[in-house]
Amino acid sequence: MAPGAPSSSPSPILAALLFSSLVLSPTLAIVVYTDREVYGAVGSQVTLHCSFWSSEWVSDDISFTWRYQPEGGRDAISIFHYAKGQPYIDEVGTFKERIQWVGDPSWKDGSIVIHNLDYSDNGTFTCDVKNPPDIVGKTSQVTLYVFEKVPTRYGVVLGAVIGGILGVVLLLLLLFYLIRYCWLRRQAALQRRLSAMEKGKFHKSSKDSSKRGRQTPVLYAMLDHSRSTKAASEKKSKGLGESRKDKK
């Protein structure tokens, strides 16, 4: 390379941008969600929920596909398809007259309802969603169990027991704090009453002391007055006696 010729190596900034576009920003795959298990009674209906997350806006070409694999079977068959805004029920299988579309693509919902359940409906249902250009992702499966009478699941019973215990504990705590509040309030009222009584006694004793203080000079004055009156009376009597002696 001649001196002063421009370098042909890529710019470090361009290389970093290329690396980030290829490695740090991979295409996000669509994610599909369903229940893990659902239960239904013979002759009733059950809703198979299906929703999804996509990095793209909901496309007009969005599609939902439901497949069914019987219990113990190996092959899955298509039983429902939604595309171009229209639901299509496959004519193959026993669900063709029992499936109802209840989904709403604008809310990313592809749910269906199966009516008139039978024991033969036990199996696995698979929901597949395509939201072009986001078409890469995994499907989601839900297993249907049909019983003559839907049993109470262990999780529901356990949750009810735990909820009951927590309710009792909260009730006991509430009762404890209520009793404690009433006791403290009563103690405060009693304390205020005692304080008022003490203040009343203090004021009464103060009034009595001041009253006695005011009465003491009066008593002394009355005593001095009686003494002086008595002395004057004695002096007068003595003078009268002396005058009588002089006359004699």
Swiss-Prot record:
Q: Which residues lie on this side of the membrane: Cytoplasmic?
A: 180-248
List keywords of the entry alphabetically: Cell membrane, Disulfide bond, Glycoprotein, Immunoglobulin domain, Membrane, Phosphoprotein, Signal, Transmembrane, Transmembrane helix
Identify the Pfam families for this entry.
Myelin-PO_C, V-set
- Native source species: Rattus norvegicus (Rat)
For this UniProt entry, which segments traverse the membrane?
A: 154-179
Family in the record:
Belongs to the myelin P0 protein family.
The Ig-like V-type domain sits at: 30-143
Annotated positions of the Phosphoserine modification: 210, 226, 228, 233, 237, 243
Signal peptide span: 1-29
Q: Ranges of Basic and acidic residues compositional bias?
A: 224-248
What the entry lists under PANTHER family is as follows: MYELIN P0 RELATED, MYELIN PROTEIN P0
Which tissues does it occur in?
Found only in peripheral nervous system Schwann cells.
Q: What is this protein called?
A: Myelin protein P0
Q: Using the chain's own numbering, where are the disulfide bonds?
A: 50-127
Q: State the membrane topology.
A: Single-pass type I membrane protein
Which residues does the record list as glycosylated?
Answer: 122
Tell me the lineage of the source organism: Eukaryota, Metazoa, Chordata, Craniata, Vertebrata
Q: Which residues lie on this side of the membrane: Extracellular?
A: 30-153
* Main localization (coarse): membrane
Post-translational modification summary for this protein:
N-glycosylated; contains sulfate-substituted glycan.
- UniProt cross-references to InterPro entries, sorted A to Z: Ig-like_dom, Ig-like_dom_sf, Ig-like_fold, Ig_sub, Ig_V-set, Myelin_P0-rel, Myelin_P0_CS, Myelin_P0_Ig-like
**Classification via SUPFAM superfamilies:** Immunoglobulin
